[in-house]
Amino acid sequence: METTPETQSKTHRLPAGREDWWSEDATATLIEAWGDRYVNLNRGNLRQNDWKEVADAVNSSHGNGRPKTDVQCKNRIDTLKKKYKTEKAKPLSNWCFFDRLDFLIGPVMKKSSGAVVKSALMNPNLNPTGSKSTGSSLDDDDDDDDDDEEDDDDAGDWGFVVRKHRKVEDVDSSEGSAFRELARSILKLGEAFERIEGKKQQMMIELEKQRMEVAKELELQRMNMLMEMQLELEKSKLGKRRAASGKKL
């Protein structure tokens, strides 16, 4: 009896001893589900509930085999990242997932490579090591269950050992330093404006005091002049009265 494709699909079994086996279709679904959340998080690390959503997306599209767990999905992504590093070092890659992963993690890899080279130039005592190879086959990887705590930063593309989480931390640190410098500059600018405004107010107060003193002085002078004029008028009237009295006598 001839076996139809439908019969083959129904009778398909996982490779012996490989409960974590991934097909290309399941891997493609995993990359899309993970990539959407990865980009939405500004290319940051996914949280546990994010990984559960990724696993649900994979299982809903490929539920024929054993359901994938969030840990298996994370380990698979770690393996894909290692494979991407290996393919990235080649002059030309024919790997079917290379373009998609290059779009997702390529920008982060470029920033990390620049940081690694700069660190190597500043620290010549770093021990050079070769990039870790993960083999040419993705479907037959044996490291999926051994990488629970392994991140994509265990080795740099330039052959120098890099601390875990270095890429994201370097980016976050540089952004944090830039924001701190900006905040300090704004604070200094505000303090300068405050000092200028304080001096301006002090000058206005001093000018108002001087204006009031001048006005007071002018008022006193006016009062004195009026009093002197009044006194002169009184003297003139008194002199006329005396003159008139002398004539009568």
From Swiss-Prot:
Q: Where is this region: Disordered?
A: 121-157
Q: Which GO terms describe its cellular component?
A: nucleoplasm; nucleus
| Bias-annotated ranges (Acidic residues) | 138-156
Task: Spell out the Pfam families in the cross-references.
Answer: Myb_DNA-bind_4 (PF13837)
Q: What are the coiled-coil residue ranges?
A: 193-224
Q: Return one Gene Ontology term, BP aspect.
A: ethylene-activated signaling pathway
UniProt KW keywords: Chromatin regulator, Coiled coil, DNA-binding, Ethylene signaling pathway, Nucleus, Transcription, Transcription regulation
**Regions of compositional bias (Polar residues) in chain numbering:** 122-137
Q: GO molecular function, one example?
A: histone binding
Q: What does this protein do?
A: Transcription regulator. Associates with chromatin regions that are associated with ethylene-responses in absence and in presence of ethylene. In the presence of ethylene, promotes histone acetylation in an EIN2- and EIN3-dependent manner, mainly on H3K14 and H3K23, thus regulating positively ethylene-responsive genes.
Q: How does it assemble?
A: Interacts with RBL. Interacts with the Agrobacterium tumefaciens virulence protein F (VirF) in the nucleus. Binds to EIN2 and EIN3 C-terminal regions in the presence of ethylene to facilitate their association with histone. Binds to histones in chromatin specific regions associated with ethylene regulated loci. Binds to the promoter region of genes influenced by ethylene. Interacts with SRT1 and SRT2; this interaction is enhanced in the presence of ethylene.
The UniProt entry, under PANTHER family, shows:
TRIHELIX TRANSCRIPTION FACTOR ASIL2 (PTHR31307), TRIHELIX TRANSCRIPTION FACTOR ENAP1-RELATED (PTHR31307:SF40)
Name of the molecule in the record: Trihelix transcription factor ENAP1
Q: Which organism is it from?
A: Arabidopsis thaliana
